[in-house]
Amino acid sequence: MQQLPIEKYSELLTKKQQKLTALLAPFNAPELSVFVSPVQNYRMRAEFRVWHDKGDLYHIMFNQQTKQRYRVDCFPIASLLINRMMENLIPLLKEQEILTKKLFQIDYLSTLSNKIIVSLLYHKTLTEEWQAAAQALKVRLEKLDFDVQIVGRATKQKICLERDYADEVLPVNGRNYVYRQIENSFTQPNAAVNCKMLEWAIGCTKNSSGDLLELYCGNGNFSIALAQNFRKVLATEIAKPSVAAAQFNIAENGIDNLQIIRMSAEEFTQAMNGVREFNRLKGIDLKSYECNTIFVDPPRAGLDPDTVKLVQNYDRILYISCNPNTLCNNLTELTKTHRIEKAALFDQFPYTDHMESGVWLIRK
């Protein structure tokens, strides 16, 4: 992996700031708050293909322009923990053929709390013999002071030696929040910038009245931190593992005013409007919620037209976006009813064109 252009970090970030400012200008956005990233070792997860070469074994990636593969022995954007694991794991794997045969990918998920999950992906069925070898590997890594979980994956097969999650601890405004992160589920890749996003969101919603609704809350990353600013919080999520992690996180952080329901945004809209009833909502009185603030963090495609209409029903909208172009598409409609009170750029992905942004909208 080539060295990072650290000396150009500020210049590259300024270009992003200028680009986002120009995109938001038609919507009368205030001056951007800009949140910087660490200049290296900021990424908490990484995925690599594995190359087998005459008895040798190493991580590879592909050049996005030329599609040529290149060897990766260290990865400066990834956490120090991932780099140390990469260095130690490969020699240990090579000692046991059953662990390297048909191995085609290695995924790493690390935490600020110094835990790491290593997922080994295979083009073969995993046997008890593989499991025994993987267990021996885990013991060897633990002797090297790694707090490690190993997960084996193959077609229609997943083997956890102990567990498939790691508990992250994020410092936010002087308080530590525990977040259970599940292997192969979405987590924010840049933990340092995630903490800044949470602090910004808490600052926007301070002194809020009423309740908060969050669509697609994942493991509760935002709703758990924001719960302090609201009477009650209602959050939806469709992925079962994320719901389970969110329930753990609610209990672990002592949050008593947050309810997670497993349903899509469309289903939730039907339930709120009384169009149909859902067994999943038994015991939850939707009418007891006075949600006048809504939080959305949609995928790159942004909000679909129906969800935009739903969101416009709320007096205050907190919108986190990973794609400024689709954010602006949505703002064309949203700014007909709301004005942008605050706007922010979060440098989740240094040295790339990707921009994570946030807008805080208030009804006109």
Curated annotation (Swiss-Prot):
Keyword Calcium: no
Residues at the active site: 322 (nucleophile), 356 (proton acceptor)
EC number(s) reported in the record: 2.1.1.-, 2.1.1.35
Keywords of this entry: Methyltransferase, S-adenosyl-L-methionine, Transferase, tRNA processing
Pfam family, one: tRNA_U5-meth_tr
UniProt-annotated binding residues for S-adenosyl-L-methionine: 188, 216, 221, 237, 297
GO molecular function, one term: tRNA binding
Gene Ontology CC entries for this record: cytosol
Gene3D superfamilies according to UniProt: 2.40.50.1070, Vaccinia Virus protein VP39
Biological process, per Gene Ontology: tRNA methylation
Disulfide feature: none
Reactions listed under catalytic activity: uridine(54) in tRNA + S-adenosyl-L-methionine = 5-methyluridine(54) in tRNA + S-adenosyl-L-homocysteine + H(+); uridine(341) in tmRNA + S-adenosyl-L-methionine = 5-methyluridine(341) in tmRNA + S-adenosyl-L-homocysteine + H(+)
Role of this protein: Dual-specificity methyltransferase that catalyzes the formation of 5-methyluridine at position 54 (m5U54) in all tRNAs, and that of position 341 (m5U341) in tmRNA (transfer-mRNA).
Family, per entry: Belongs to the class I-like SAM-binding methyltransferase superfamily. RNA M5U methyltransferase family. TrmA subfamily.
Name this protein carries in UniProt: tRNA/tmRNA (uracil-C(5))-methyltransferase
Organism the protein comes from: Mannheimia succiniciproducens (strain KCTC 0769BP / MBEL55E)
Highest classification ranks of the organism: Bacteria, Pseudomonadati, Pseudomonadota, Gammaproteobacteria, Pasteurellales
Gene behind the chain: trmA
